[in-house]
């Protein structure tokens, strides 16, 4: 299922296919805003791991209405952002760090994962996200 969703996400994002032409089960998991196959795999790992479906590529703004960032995955009720860091992110480290600082200064918690995390230790990824979701529920 995950690999089917990866393909569909990329086809929708590239506007190669319309969602009306998709298998309904696969379409129910599809997210055309997803920007990479590993983001799709990370999202599906969380959903198939029993976690709520995160929102994808949500623009976030500070209290003055200024753009802060657009995390790959986001749980708005928990103010939890999740980023997939691919190999090309090493070249953008400075900007990623600045965006992370802006998000944190606005009260958004942030988790970052790599391909190694998603593919080699998926249980740890799900567990860490689950813990952050539970922790936020207990606040306030």
What are these model-predicted stretches?
Residues 1-140:
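Surface segments flanking catalytic/ligand-binding clefts of nucleic-acid enzymes
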């Amino acid at each position: 299922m995950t690999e089917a969703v990866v393909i569909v996400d990329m086809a929708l994002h590239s506007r190669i296919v319309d969602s009306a032409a998709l298998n309904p089960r696969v379409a129910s998991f599809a997210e055309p805003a997803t920007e990479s196959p590993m983001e799709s795999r990370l999202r599906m790992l969380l959903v198939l791991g029993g976690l709520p479906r995160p929102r994808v590529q949500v623009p976030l703004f500070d209290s003055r209405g200024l753009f802060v960032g657009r995390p790959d995955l986001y749980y708005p009720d928990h103010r939890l952002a999740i980023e997939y860091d691919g190999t090309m992110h090493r070249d953008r480290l400075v900007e990623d760090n600045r965006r992370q600082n802006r998000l944190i200064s606005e009260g958004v918690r942030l988790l970052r994962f790599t391909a190694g995390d998603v593919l080699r230790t998926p249980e740890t990824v799900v567990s860490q996200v689950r813990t952050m979701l539970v922790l936020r529920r207990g606040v306030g």
